[in-house]
Amino acid sequence: RLVFISSITMLLVSPIGHISWDIDSHFKFAISSSSVAYVGLSEPELEVLTNGADFIQNTDTYVQNTEKINTLNKNSDAIIKYIDHNISLTALPSGVMIALLRLFGANFFVIYKLGQIPIVLIYSLCCYFAMRRLHSGKMILAVVAMFPTSLFIASNYSYDTWVIGFVMIGMAYFVGNCQEKGVVSTKDTIIMVIAFAIAIIPKQIYLAFLVIPFLMKQDKIENKKKYYSICSMAFVIMLFDL
């Protein structure tokens, strides 16, 4: 709950502009996932994708930020360019939100800001289920989840939130089973493997995370053939980045 409230607060109070890493690219992923055909762009949306002056200019006061929002909203009705759709699994939640907001005629500012809410929700849910699985170390995970950088990324267009959140779930199931007596259940194995596989879909550079399930203690594995077969499926799952 605290993660969600903190992230939403950051989202709402942050000035509009290029305030995070590669906003132009990540917003393009989101808006490209908002349609199954060509995606129409309004002038302010194109400003985001091209880092136009009206979008990236700095504002120092509330009044300046309000004026900037009004300037961007002024030309948000007309479509001036079309781009190809490109549905991505990690950007799809934001894409669906953007599509719904467009359906109801929301202006650019509302679309841009509320399109980030699914990112906050996914991150918050990942943190919740990860902490729920651990027997001890919940506070350590909570501290990591509440790092200002993590919250800031979660309140902006980014697929890094997806990586952080699902890695937390995967690690929680791995560590949680190490803390328990008995063998690893098939259910926990599947959840752990899927979490790691989903986490690295946006960035295959994190491929090393798929090795973690293979490091489970031997005495925790009841059926080694079955366990390692499930772990190997992660390499197949990660290929399904739509």
Task: Please give the residue ranges for each predicted region.
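Alpha-helical transmembrane segments of integral membrane proteins
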Residues: 1-2, 140, 163, 187-195, ...
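Perimembrane helix-loop-helix junctions
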Residues: 173-183, 207-238
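Membrane-interface alpha helices of multi-pass inner-membrane proteins
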Residues: 152, 188-204, 209-215
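Transmembrane-helix signature of polytopic, membrane-embedded enzymes
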Residues: 106-109, 128-149
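Short acidic/glycine- and proline-prone juxtamembrane loop motifs at membrane-interface regions
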Residues: 156-163
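Transmembrane signal-anchor helices characteristic of membrane glycosylation enzymes that use polyprenol
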Residues: 1-66, 233-242
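Interfacial juxtamembrane loops and adjacent helix segments
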Residues: 31-114
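Specific aromatic-rich, kink-prone transmembrane helix
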Residues: 129, 164-181, 190-196
